[in-house]
C-alpha cells in the first residue's frame, strides 16, 4: 500500500497542488491547485454537474452569494450550534478537536467508534479510560472540553461594529433553502425537484489536515432535493444509490469505499436517516459524501425567522405542506483527492518500473498527448494538436526520448499518447498508445476525435 506522502510528493512535483503562499512560508493548511490539479478538479465538478443537474429531469442549478444576511445563520442554527469540541494540551498549549483525538487513539488500538454525538463528559471519560495523549508532546494533561464556533466572522462596510457583523458561509445549502420559492416559481417546478450548486465554503477548523482532505477553505457540490413528506425515505435510498454509482462510473473501486449508516445516537436531531459514503485513504477511512434526509427542518426554520411562506400546494390534491428535503453533500476537494489516491499506482514492469495515475478518461487532466517522434515533425504534429484542442484538453510534448515522454504522461494520468512519426506525413495516421495496457494501435488522424469522444463517456 502506498503512503499519503507518495501521493503528496507526486501532486506537488507534477503540478497538481502547491502549498498556498509558499514564497512567504505558506499559510497553514492552504493549498493552490496547479495547472493539472485545476483540470482534474474541474473535470470532477463537470462530471457531478452532468449527472446531478444536466441529466436529471428533476434538478436545476443555482449559484448563491457567499456573503448572506447574518439572520440566515441564526435561523439555520449555525450561530448557536455550529461548534466542535475543543481541548488544549496544558503542557505544549497545542489545540485539538477532542472527538478526533479519541477516534485516532481508539483506531490505533483497532477499536472502531464514532465519537460524534457523545456528551463532553462521555468524551472526557473515554480520554481517561484510553489514556489519550497529545500527538504533539505526549502529555495526558488537558483542559476541559469546550465549544468552539467554526464560522469565520468579518464586517461589512467601513465600521467594525456588531451591527455590521457578517459571516463567510460554512456551507452552500442555506443559499438554496432561502431561494426555494424563487426557484420553484420561476422554473415552474412541481415536487419532487432539486436545486444543486457548487461553491466555496469556509470553516475555522480546529485541526485541519491530511493534505486537501480537511481545509478551512473548501468547495462543496450540494443538492437539496425536495419531496412530499412520506416519500422522503424512498428518495433518500434513490440518491444514496445514485451517489455510489456515480463514483463507480468514474472508476472508483468498490473495495476503496463503504457506506456507513448513522446510528440513532449519531443522527442530527432533524434527520431521520443519514449515510456517509467513505473512502479508504492511505491515512484511513474518511467521509466523501453525506447523504441526509433532513425532513422539513430547514424550510420551517427559515419560515419562522423570515415570515416567508414556504408551504407547497399540491396541484393534484390541493394539499398544503412544507416539503421534506434529501441532501447529498459532497466535498469537491475531498473527492478529487480520493480519485487521485485511487488512481495512484507504482507498477513493476519486466525491465522497468513506472508511476501511473489510472484516472477515468473523463477525469484525466489531459485526454491525450501529441508526441512528434522528431522535432522535424513538429509542424504536422502541431496541426493534430490544434484540431484536437478545439474539443479536448491535450498536451504537446517534443522534449526527450519517446520512452521518457510516455512515462511523464503516465505519471500525470494521460490516458492516450498519440505519436506522430515519419509515416504520418504520408499515410495521415498516428500511433495511439493506451496508458493502462501500454498497447499501441495505428489510427487515421481523422478518427481521433470520435475515438476520444467515445472514451471520455461515463
Swiss-Prot record:
Keyword Nucleotide-binding: yes
Regions that span the bilayer: none
Keyword annotations of the record: Aminoacyl-tRNA synthetase, ATP-binding, Cytoplasm, Ligase, Nucleotide-binding, Protein biosynthesis
List of residues binding substrate: 97, 171, 218-222, 327-331
Catalyzed reactions: tRNA(Gly) + glycine + ATP = glycyl-tRNA(Gly) + AMP + diphosphate
The organism's taxonomic lineage, starting at the top: Bacteria, Bacillati, Bacillota, Bacilli, Bacillales
Residues annotated as binding ATP: 203-205, 213-218, 287-288, 331-334
Gene Ontology process terms (BP): glycyl-tRNA aminoacylation
Enzyme Commission (EC) number: 6.1.1.14
Any matching Pfam family: HGTP_anticodon
Record InterPro entries: aa-tRNA-synt_IIb, aa-tRNA-synth_II, aa-tRNA-synth_II/BPL/LPL, Anticodon-bd, Anticodon-bd_dom_sf, Gly-tRNA_synthase/POLG2, Gly_tRNA_ligase_bac, GlyRS-like_core
Family: Belongs to the class-II aminoacyl-tRNA synthetase family.
Gene: glyQS
CDD domains: GlyRS-like_core (cd00774), GlyRS_anticodon (cd00858)
Protein name, as recorded: Glycine--tRNA ligase
Assembly and binders: Homodimer.
One GO cellular component term: cytoplasm
Primary location class: cytoplasm
Localization per Swiss-Prot or TrEMBL: Cytoplasm
Role according to the record: Catalyzes the attachment of glycine to tRNA(Gly).
GO MF term set: ATP binding; catalytic activity, acting on a protein; glycine-tRNA ligase activity; protein dimerization activity; transferase activity
Amino acid at each position: 500500500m502506498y503512503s499519503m506522502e507518495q501521493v503528496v510528493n507526486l501532486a506537488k512535483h507534477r503540478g497538481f497542488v502547491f502549498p498556498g503562499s509558499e514564497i512567504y512560508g505558506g499559510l497553514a493548511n492552504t493549498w493552490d491547485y496547479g495547472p493539472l490539479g485545476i483540470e482534474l478538479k474541474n473535470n470532477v465538478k463537470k462530471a457531478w454537474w452532468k449527472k446531478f443537474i444536466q441529466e436529471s429531469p428533476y434538478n436545476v442549478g443555482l449559484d448563491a452569494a457567499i456573503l448572506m444576511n447574518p439572520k440566515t445563520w441564526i435561523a439555520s442554527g449555525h450561530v448557536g450550534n455550529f461548534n466542535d469540541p475543543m481541548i488544549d494540551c496544558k503542557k505544549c498549549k497545542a489545540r485539538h478537536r477532542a472527538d478526533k483525538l479519541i477516534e485516532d487513539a481508539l483506531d490505533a488500538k483497532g477499536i472502531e467508534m464514532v465519537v460524534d454525538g457523545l456528551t463532553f463528559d462521555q468524551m472526557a471519560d473515554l480520554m481517561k479510560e484510553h489514556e489519550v495523549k497529545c500527538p504533539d508532546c505526549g502529555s495526558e494533561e488537558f483542559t476541559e472540553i469546550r465549544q468552539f464556533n467554526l464560522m469565520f466572522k468579518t464586517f461589512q462596510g467601513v465600521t467594525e461594529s456588531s451591527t455590521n457583523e457578517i459571516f463567510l458561509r460554512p456551507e452552500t445549502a442555506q443559499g438554496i433553502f432561502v431561494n426555494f420559492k424563487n426557484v420553484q416559481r420561476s422554473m415552474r417546478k412541481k415536487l419532487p425537484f432539486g436545486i444543486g450548486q457548487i461553491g466555496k465554503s469556509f470553516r475555522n477548523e480546529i485541526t485541519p489536515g491530511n493534505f486537501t482532505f480537511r481545509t478551512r477553505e473548501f468547495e462543496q457540490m450540494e443538492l437539496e432535493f425536495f419531496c412530499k413528506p412520506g416519500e422522503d425515505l424512498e428518495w433518500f435510498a434513490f440518491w444514496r444509490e445514485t451517489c455510489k454509482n456515480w463514483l463507480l462510473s468514474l472508476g472508483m473501486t468498490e473495495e476503496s469505499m463503504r457506506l456507513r449508516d448513522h446510528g440513532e445516537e449519531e443522527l442530527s436531531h432533524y434527520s431521520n436517516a443519514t449515510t456517509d459514503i467513505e473512502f479508504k485513504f492511505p491515512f484511513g477511512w474518511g467521509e466523501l459524501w453525506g447523504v441526509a434526509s433532513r425532513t422539513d427542518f430547514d424550510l420551517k426554520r427559515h419560515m419562522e425567522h423570515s415570515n416567508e411562506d414556504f408551504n407547497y400546494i399540491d396541484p393534484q390534491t390541493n394539499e398544503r405542506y412544507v416539503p421534506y428535503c434529501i441532501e447529498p453533500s459532497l466535498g469537491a476537494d475531498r473527492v478529487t483527492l480520493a480519485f487521485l489516491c485511487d488512481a495512484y499506482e507504482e507498477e513493476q514492469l519486466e525491465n522497468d518500473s513506472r508511476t501511473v495515475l489510472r484516472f477515468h478518461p473523463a477525469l484525466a487532466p489531459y485526454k491525450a498527448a501529441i508526441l512528434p517522434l522528431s522535432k522535424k515533425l513538429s509542424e504536422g504534429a502541431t496541426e493534430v494538436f490544434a484540431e484536437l484542442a478545439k474539443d479536448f484538453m491535450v498536451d504537446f510534448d517534443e522534449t526527450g526520448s519517446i520512452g521518457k515522454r510516455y512515462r511523464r504522461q503516465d505519471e500525470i494520468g494521460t490516458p492516450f499518447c498519440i505519436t506522430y512519426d515519419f509515416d504520418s506525413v504520408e499515410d495521415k495516421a498516428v500511433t495511439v498508445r493506451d496508458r493502462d495496457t501500454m498497447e499501441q494501435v495505428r489510427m487515421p488522424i481523422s478518427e481521433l476525435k470520435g475515438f476520444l469522444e467515445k472514451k471520455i463517456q461515463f
